Amino acid sequence: RHPLRMLFHGLGTQAGLGGGSSDAASTLLALNKLWRTRLSRQELTAIGLQLGADVPFFLLGDNAWVEGIGEQLTAIDYPPTPFMLLKPPVGLSTIQIFKDPNLKRDTKPATIAGFAEIENEHKHLFGRNDLQPVAETHCPDIRHCVDLLKGYQPSARMTGSGSTVFAPWFLNHDLQAIPSNWYHLRCMSLKNHPLKHWAD
């Protein structure tokens, strides 16, 4: 069989939201079901890791604490939370960010134990993004996005290698006074991947 796959979504490239990795994971799950190969989630994960470091996370199907290069996953309970996404009209290359000599690689690692100690309603305050300072030098608009969102939510920060910025959004109104060419979206996080049940 030769599946024809057409995909439409609103995520731009180089957004730092794992769009490509999510697509890869969904494709693996769909082919596993279509071709009735009955590969286990563990087997799919081994394949997914060869496609990209973030693919195993999307194959897991749960919110997770991720370590290593993306293959060490611990499922966590994280309640559905409203978020605001804000992205300038430019993207960033992940390779470019990781090759930057100014990227700090010796910061103290965050731990799942520290995350577990925080009450659910404050978990969004945990953590940091070590890629953000470097990304901001390559794309100053990221800093502008962070500053704008921090006016509403102090925990605003960049996601992935950029260039999207996110913050929990418990307000009833939309963002105000943003440039017309910036992408923004109010969304709700999911407790599970919609296709999680397609793998054992």
Where are these regions (language model features)?
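Short pre-catalytic strand/loop immediately N-terminal to key active-site residues, enriched for Gly-Thr
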Residues: 2-18, 155-156
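A structural preference for short, hydrophobic beta-strand core positions in alpha/beta folds
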Residues: 7, 158-161, 186
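DPxDG-like acidic metal-binding loop motif
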Residues: 15-43
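Glycine-rich beta-strand-to-loop/alpha-helix junction loops that act as flexible
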Residues: 19-20, 159-163
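Short, well-structured alpha-helical segments that form the helix of a local strand-helix-strand
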Residues: 40-50, 146-147, 176-178
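Conserved, helical-rich catalytic subdomain that frames metal- and/or nucleotide-binding sites
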Residues: 58-60, 65-155, 170-200
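Short beta-strand->loop micro-motif that forms the acidic, two-metal-ion catalytic signature
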Residues: 164-168
